Structures are given as structure tokens and as C-alpha cells.
């Protein structure tokens, strides 16, 4: 009978525990995985101290230094050797949408084949010359016929196919060289051009001539973004195969770049402002100020004769020296930007202002009057990327599931909310006060303003933790390393002191018996020792006055 009672008691306890579990996480999470925020009682919640950024994954493609890694306006980020000569070549990993090269004072397009044979230099452009087998310009359809037996190449999208095609050709017979030609893809007619000239800018009287009469002089050219280039994309041998998803190819509508600061996307404190009538002009500005591998000391104005003349008149030796040995020709001036520059911009459609900055953004601010763009982005105003309105609610739900998965097992019914204070669902904020709705937002976002922020943004756009909270975010590993370093340093100091004491205690004193030094006794090391040694009489004779006089004393021989 007792056994039956025990079984009944155990079953009752099991059912009670099972009931408690069902009242936990399962109650607030639906079968499809959605969190029922309205069922969470505020008295059973608390705020996590963990600093997270819901934009981290989304903003990876806007880290231009990482995803592109080279110059944008001028890309010469890699070195290649051809026949014992070093050359600089483009190496960016993302396409530069809308980038073209303008030949100064010329109606010739840079996509025209370079001049060969009896042609005048100014009759040609920068593209590959005619070859026995046509390789440029070539349509995508013809490229697919050319590589019909190579499935891995045919699997590429049109732009990647163009870049891959250009990378197959090397100069002359240098099969082992890393030198590869850049390419341009024109999406309007699906045509691929291989550029014969890797340079993207050639300016200044030393290097080129803008005079139309100088038909056989090198012409001047410069990279630009303008409306006639909107269908073009500048490509290199390093183009990423996943460029469609990993590069910032489009501008973002109803958005501006910002910096994530403890639960909220904040505006940049430091930025440059330009007046622009259109998004196209803003895109041109950020392109012109973007990362560039062009030599910084590039002379664009004075001719050598003018420099010498002015140097003599002004008695300026520096100008004369620059004429004889031009600046920008030194190895140290061969800049590699690695993608660092003013690569991002926010365009205000209402005030017609363009804000550019060189600090990578870590989030987006939803604003109906703005468009966020980059130096890599397309010039086309549509289609643009849409603002992800559900990003905050999704991240809040995800964090609640992760942070509270074991809460019932630990006997704790309190639900933790992440440090995200903006969402299109105000119930998901768990705000202790009434959230404020943003009027400029197209997503109808709500913001919780009554929770103290643990971070702030400095004047240089750096995100820092407030002093009163720093101790909570110091890494235990760093603290442990600091303790280990202090212990090692203390041990080294103690060891040094012990070694010093040991040698000092064993050092001969002033009254050391010199007779113990049998090999050196009587063989003074200096004339001074021989003449002034007061111990000259220590072998039994009385001291005499001569021990203070400069006379040579010797030990008698036994």
C-alpha cells in the first residue's frame, strides 16, 4: 500500500513541475517562434547589461576597407612585376558602379582602343587594341560561347564573367606575372571591355598635354562619376564572386548612416558638408573624396620651365629642385590607401546638402528626407535598397530566446530584455515610460528615452563607455593578463636585487690581502699602483717615506 502512495506522490510532483515549465518560456513564445511581448508582465523583467548591435551583420558590406580593400577613385593597390620592372595595378574586390575615365579636351571615349601603328595618340582611348582573336570589346553572349566547355565560368553572373575573362590575359609571354588588366562592364548593351592602360589619372604638364594640336603627346585623363557613365562598372582581377550581396552596390532609400551607441543609432558628430542639388552630385562628391591610391604629391599645374624661372626670381631652391627631380616620383609616395577615405555620404533631399565622412558606419537611421550612399554605389536613383523596418523587433525576439532559454531550470522567472531602445513594436521595448514615436521615420519607429545610456559618441565619432560603467565591461582575460604581467615584473625586480646583493657580498674589500693573488702579486697593473702603493713595506720592514714618493717598489724574491 505504501508503494502505491509513493507512486502517487511522485506523479503529483512530476505534474506540478511540468505545469511550472509550461508557464515559462513556452507561454510567451508561439508555435511559429514569435515572441508574444504583450504577455510578458513588466514586473518580471529586467534589462541586460550586454552591449549588442542588431546591425552588425547587415552593415558588413559597408565596411569598405574590409570588403573592397583598395582605392576607389584611383585604384592602384597592388604591385606586379613584368620583365624585371615593377608596375602598380588595380586590385579592388568590389565593382565601382558608375566609374568612368574622362579624356581631357577630347571627344574620344576611354573605351576606344588605344592608338597603334600609324594612328595619332589622341585618336585612341585606353581599351585593348585589336587582336587576331577578338577578346575586347565582346558581348556576354559571345563570352558564353567562348567558354561553353567551362561550366564553372558559365555559372558566373555577367559582371563576374567579364572580370574573369579579363584576368585570363597577361602581357607578352610573362605567364608567371601577377599583372592583369582591369575591365569595364556596360550593362546597357551587356558588353565587356578590357582596358589596356591600368592608370586612371594622368594630369599635369610634366606627364600630358591638354592641347588638341599635340596629337602625338600623351593626353590627360581623370576618373569621374557622371550621368553618361551610369551603366558602367569598373572591375579588377580580384572581383568578389559574391559582390552582389557583399558590396554596397546601391544607395539606401529613407536612410542615413550612423553609429550604434548603446541601444540606439546616433548621428555622426564630425562630418563634412557640401551643397548639392541632386543625389548624383552628392555621389560625385563622395567619389572624388574617396579612397585613392594616386600619389599625394601629384603636380598638376606648373611646367618645369615655369618652376625654374619662378625659382630663380623668388630665390626658391625647392622649386628648382622639383623641376629637376619631380615630386611624386619617389617610392615612398606610391600611396596604397587600402580603402581608407571619405567613402560614405548622407544626402538630404530637403535641404539639398551632402554630408560625407571617413568613419565607417555601424547602423542606419530611418529618415524620410535622406538617402545613404557610398563611393562604390550606383548613380541610378532607382531601384534602391529598402530600409529593413523589422530589424529591431527581430533582434529583440532573438535575444530574449537566447537569454531566457534556461531561466526556468535556474528557478528564475525574470525575463531579460536586450539593450535595444528602438523598434516598430513599442511592446517589444519594455520601456519603463511611454515610448516616443519618431515623426521622420517611415517605419513608424518608437524610441525609449528613459533608460540611461552606458555609451556616448565623442567629437571624433568614437564610441566610448561612460566612466561609471567601465569596470563592468573590462575583460576578465585582460585583468588576468595585467595581474600576470605585474607578478612577472615584480619577480624580475626581486631576482635582479638578489643577484646584485649576491655579487656585492662576494666582492673583495679595500683591505683584501694582495698576497693571496700569487700570480699577479708584484706585477702592478699600472704605473700608479707601482709608485704610490702604501703596502710596499708590508713584508716586515717598517714603512718608509718612499711609499708616498713616485719610486718603483718590487717584492723581494724568495
Curated annotation (Swiss-Prot):
Give the UniProt keywords, A-Z.
Disulfide bond, Glycoprotein, Malaria, Membrane, Signal, Transmembrane, Transmembrane helix
Say yes or no: keyword Membrane present: yes
Gene Ontology cellular component annotations, sorted alphabetically: membrane
Where on this protein are sugars attached?
Answer: 20, 189, 231, 249, 276, 288, 412
Task: List all membrane-crossing ranges.
Answer: 481-503
Q: Does the keyword Membrane apply?
A: yes
The UniProt entry's sequence similarity note says: Belongs to the apicomplexan parasites AMA1 family.
Topology relative to the lipid bilayer, per the entry, is:
Single-pass type I membrane protein
Instruction: Please explain the role this protein plays, according to its UniProt record.
Output: Involved in parasite invasion of erythrocytes.
- Protein name according to UniProt: Apical membrane antigen 1
Where does it primarily localize?
membrane
Check the record and name the Gene3D superfamilies matching this protein.
Answer: Apical membrane antigen 1, Hepatocyte Growth Factor
Note the SS bond partners.
94-247, 162-192, 208-220, 265-363, 282-354, 389-443, 431-448, 433-450
| Side of membrane Cytoplasmic, spans | 504-558
Q: How far does the signal peptide extend, from start to end residue?
A: 1-21
Topology feature Extracellular, residues: 22-480
The gene designation is AMA-1
Localization recorded for this chain is:
Membrane
Amino acid at each position: 500500500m505504501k508503494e502505491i502512495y509513493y507512486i502517487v506522490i511522485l506523479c503529483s510532483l512530476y505534474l506540478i513541475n511540468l505545469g511550472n515549465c509550461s508557464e515559462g518560456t513556452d507561454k510567451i513564445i508561439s508555435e511559429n517562434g514569435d515572441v508574444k511581448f504583450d504577455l510578458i508582465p513588466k514586473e518580471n523583467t529586467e534589462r541586460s547589461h550586454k552591449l549588442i548591435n542588431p546591425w552588425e551583420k547587415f552593415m558588413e558590406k559597408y565596411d569598405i576597407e574590409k570588403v573592397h580593400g583598395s582605392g576607389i577613385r584611383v585604384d592602384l593597390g597592388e604591385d606586379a612585376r613584368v620583365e624585371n620592372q615593377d608596375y602598380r595595378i588595380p586590385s579592388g574586390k568590389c565593382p565601382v558602379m558608375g566609374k568612368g575615365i574622362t579624356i581631357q579636351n577630347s571627344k574620344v571615349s576611354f573605351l576606344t582602343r588605344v592608338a597603334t601603328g600609324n594612328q595619332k595618340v589622341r585618336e585612341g582611348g585606353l581599351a585593348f587594341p585589336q587582336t587576331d582573336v577578338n577578346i575586347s570589346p565582346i558581348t556576354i553572349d559571345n563570352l558564353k560561347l567562348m567558354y561553353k566547355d567551362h561550366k564553372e565560368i558559365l555559372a558566373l553572373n555577367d559582371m563576374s564573367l567579364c572580370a574573369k575573362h579579363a584576368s585570363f590575359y597577361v602581357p607578352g609571354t610573362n605567364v608567371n606575372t601577377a599583372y592583369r588588366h582591369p575591365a569595364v562592364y556596360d550593362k546597357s548593351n551587356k558588353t565587356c571591355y578590357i582596358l589596356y592602360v591600368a592608370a586612371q589619372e594622368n594630369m599635369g604638364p610634366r606627364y600630358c598635354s591638354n592641347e588638341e594640336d599635340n596629337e602625338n603627346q600623351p593626353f590627360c585623363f581623370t576618373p569621374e562619376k557622371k550621368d553618361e557613365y551610369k551603366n558602367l562598372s569598373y572591375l579588377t582581377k580580384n572581383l568578389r564572386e559574391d559582390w552582389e550581396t557583399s558590396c554596397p552596390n546601391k544607395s539606401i532609400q529613407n536612410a542615413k548612416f550612423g553609429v550604434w551607441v548603446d541601444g540606439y543609432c546616433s548621428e555622426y558628430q564630425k562630418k563634412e558638408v557640401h551643397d548639392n542639388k541632386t543625389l548624383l552630385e552628392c555621389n560625385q562628391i563622395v567619389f572624388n573624396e574617396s579612397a585613392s591610391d594616386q600619389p599625394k604629391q601629384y603636380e598638376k599645374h606648373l611646367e618645369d620651365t615655369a618652376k625654374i624661372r619662378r625659382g630663380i626670381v623668388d630665390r626658391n631652391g625647392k622649386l628648382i629642385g622639383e623641376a629637376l627631380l619631380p615630386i611624386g616620383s619617389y617610392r615612398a609616395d606610391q600611396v596604397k590607401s587600402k580603402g581608407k577615405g571619405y567613402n560614405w555620404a548622407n544626402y538630404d533631399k530637403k535641404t539639398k546638402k551632402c554630408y560625407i565622412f571617413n568613419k565607417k558606419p555601424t547602423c542606419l537611421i530611418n529618415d524620410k528626407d535622406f538617402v545613404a550612399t557610398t563611393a562604390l554605389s550606383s548613380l541610378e536613383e532607382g531601384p534602391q535598397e529598402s530600409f529593413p523596418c523589422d530589424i529591431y523587433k527581430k533582434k529583440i525576439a532573438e535575444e530574449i530566446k537566447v537569454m531566457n532559454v534556461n531561466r526556468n531550470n535556474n528557478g528564475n522567472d525574470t525575463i531579460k530584455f536586450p539593450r535595444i531602445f528602438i523598434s516598430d513594436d513599442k511592446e517589444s521595448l519594455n520601456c519603463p515610460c511611454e515610448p516616443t514615436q519618431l515623426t521622420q521615420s517611415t517605419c513608424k519607429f518608437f524610441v525609449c528615452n528613459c533608460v540611461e545610456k552606458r555609451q556616448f559618441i565623442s567629437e571624433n565619432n568614437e564610441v566610448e563607455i561612460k566612466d561609471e560603467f567601465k569596470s563592468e565591461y573590462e575583460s576578465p582575460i585582460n585583468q588576468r593578463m595585467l595581474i600576470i604581467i605585474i607578478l612577472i615584473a615584480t619577480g624580475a625586480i626581486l631576482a635582479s636585487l638578489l643577484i646584485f646583493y649576491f655579487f656585492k657580498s662576494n666582492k673583495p674589500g679595500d683591505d683584501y690581502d694582495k698576497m693571496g693573488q700569487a700570480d699577479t702579486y708584484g706585477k702592478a697593473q699600472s704605473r700608479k699602483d707601482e709608485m704610490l702603493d702604501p703596502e710596499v713595506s708590508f713584508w716586515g720592514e717598517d714603512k718608509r717615506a718612499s711609499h708616498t714618493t713616485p719610486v718603483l717598489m718590487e717584492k723581494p724574491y724568495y
